[in-house]
Amino acid sequence: KAIRHMGIRIDTPAEEIARIPATGPLVVVSNHPSGLVDGMVLAEMVNRVRSDFRILTRSLLTGIPEVEEFMIPVPFPHEDNARELGLQMRDETMKHLRGGGVIILFPAGKVAMSEGWWGPAVEAEWNVFTHKIVRSSGATIVPVFFPGQNSRAFLIANKLSDTLRQGLLLHEIKRCLFKPTRPVIGAP
């Protein structure tokens, strides 16, 4: 519903969306070029096939009652109880997969950023937790690729200041409004 209100048209063909298995444990992995909109688009595409999905997302995004049931909070490393919260996240994720559900995640755990001032945005290495889920869950894995990257201003702001970068987050969401997007869904 939010995608429709934002005017974001998903141009992924039906035959690619059909690659999402309708039943059984599933992990959907994707690059993360844009931020919040990536997760919203993935949720919309998966929801066209099945509604038993949960998205691993930063804990600050989980306090919205309308979407909270679809979220599993990922703690920030600097949080006082990050280790305990991380274990809870892992347990909740594995329980959901054992129950035959879908987990949507961004393996790098953060939005793609440029390594230098002017280079292209690149994904960070997958975090250890992602490797463990993929290996130990026995779930089917479906890869998704989003083309594009955030604005150069955002990528430069990331080099200068966390506050400046965070201040531009809404601008980056606004750049996605009323535009088509064409994620590519790979074979399981």
Predicted features by range, described:
Residues 1-29, 39-41, 48-52, 68-69, ...:
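Membrane-anchoring hydrophobic helices of lipid-metabolizing enzymes
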Residues 3-8, 32, 79-84, 119-120:
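Short, flexible loop segments at the rims of nucleotide/cofactor-binding pockets, characterized by
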Residues 10, 53-55, 103, 141:
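Hydrophobic beta-strand scaffold residues
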Residues 29-31, 71-80, 114-117:
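Short, basic, glycine/proline-bearing loop/turn elements
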Residues 32-36, 111-112:
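Gly/Ser/Thr-rich loops at beta-strand to alpha-helix junctions
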Residues 47, 53-86, 90-93, 97:
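Conserved nucleotide-cofactor-binding alpha/beta core module
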Residues 102, 110-188:
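A cross-family acyltransferase "interaction/gating" segment
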